[in-house]
Amino acid sequence: MTTEEAMPEKAKCPTLEITKQDFFQEAKTLIAQHYEKINENKVQGTSINVFRKKHQKPKSGKYIPLEIDKKVTRDVVQEHRAALRRICFPKELSKSEHLQEPPQRISFKEPHIFSRRERCRPIDLITKGQVKLDKIMTIIEPVSKKMETAKQQHFEESRNRMLELLYPFPVHLYLQPGTSNLELLKEPDKAFYDWRGFVLTRSFRLACDSRRVSFSQSSSIFRDYYSKTFKTLIKKERQPIKPEPKSQPRIKGTPNKTDKLDSKVKRIGPHIEIFQVFRERKKFMITPKLIRMVTVMQAHVRGWLERKRLQRVMTKALDHGPDMKAVINMYGRLIHRVRYRRGLWRTRQILNLAELEEWMDRKKFYEIMFAKREDWPKIERNELPNFFSDCGHFPTQKQVDDTWDLVHQDGKEKYSELIKKSKAIEMLFTLYPPEGAHVPDSTLLKSTWLRPIVNGEEGYRYIVNGHPALKRANIRVVGKLVARSIRERKMRQHYKSCKVE
């Protein structure tokens, strides 16, 4: 029965009949191969040296996690120790034969399981020389997987915390060793925040086509984990980071009554005209240099104005005579006659272009008005008041007769009923002398009730034409004014007669 029971066990699980020394050597090689596979498939750290230059080679640095859960590591180490105690390695193992892991990214303190102080308990299977390989592998493999997963979880948590503190954008990417920050900026038209803090219109992709990590069959957990993380990162990369919205100016609400009043009352103080009158004016310093500058400027301006006026006078003179000299002589003789008829013996005049231009304009206007009325070169004497009114003058009949006598002193045309154009125009210049004659106001026409003159302008033209500015006077006020003036005149005549007697 014992032989029959032993046969199916051998069929199910093959046993290895070896000596004690061969078994230890085989277990040693198996464990070493297992750790070598794990170390080959491990991913190197993802920390990027952003200050590394292009010519520098990437350095493999160790990453020390911030915090490690001691309880979890203690349980894993204890399980590993228990599994190795079951295998019961010999006491003769020296320090040179210890299994040492290559330096990793994480400074993880491994237990010294092969120390000489630890004593292994003997097992019956070793004394018998029969050990099952499948049991050894089933014991070792889950314990090593648990240890690796615990290390990887601690590594990922600590690395993500550090990256969140160092970088303003989520770069929890598993980059290959040797990649720089310049390789991230490859594709245009996408915005993200790089390590310097400002927005760039470029995107980044992981250059993992040629540098993909080769995972072995034993590290399938890492392969699944990395495939999931790469997919999530690619999805996040396709979504461009939206820039922060610009701060818009605040829209003011409806103004209150106080705001309206404040806007109306812009300044509290006196009126601007009163302020200008009473304010202190700054004294303007007049220096000889400033006087010379002003004099030169005025000379330039006045010279330009006089030259322009001379050009106008020369063009207008062609309408009154053959040349400029003949027109000036004509103007001088007319001024001499006007002053002589007014009783002024100093008939010398100084030529002024402005006065000459004024006389030429008036003479041209009178000639046009005379041409409208004449059927031949002469008009009748009784048509003179109408001719004068067309020219804008309203003298009385007595003034017209007196001027007729002054103009026709020779006696030949004095009793004629026809008048030429030249004599009619000269009568107007005698009644209303030009500016060049310089006749005093005492010899000019006086203002009367029927022919008022205000500031040298006849008011009768407004009465005749019916100007809207004129108002109908109150007859009582006018009667009182006329009666007072008549009474004063009679009283003056009475006092004069009393003095003579």
Swiss-Prot record:
The SS bond pairs are none
InterPro entries, sorted: IQ_motif_EF-hand-BS
Query: Where are the coiled-coil regions?
Result: none
Stretches for region Disordered: 237-262
PROSITE patterns reported for this sequence: IQ
Q: Which residues form the IQ domain?
A: 290-319
Gene encoding the protein: IQCM
- SMART domains (alphabetical): IQ (SM00015)
Q: Where is the composition biased (Basic and acidic residues)?
A: 237-247
Please identify the protein, giving its name as recorded. IQ domain-containing protein M
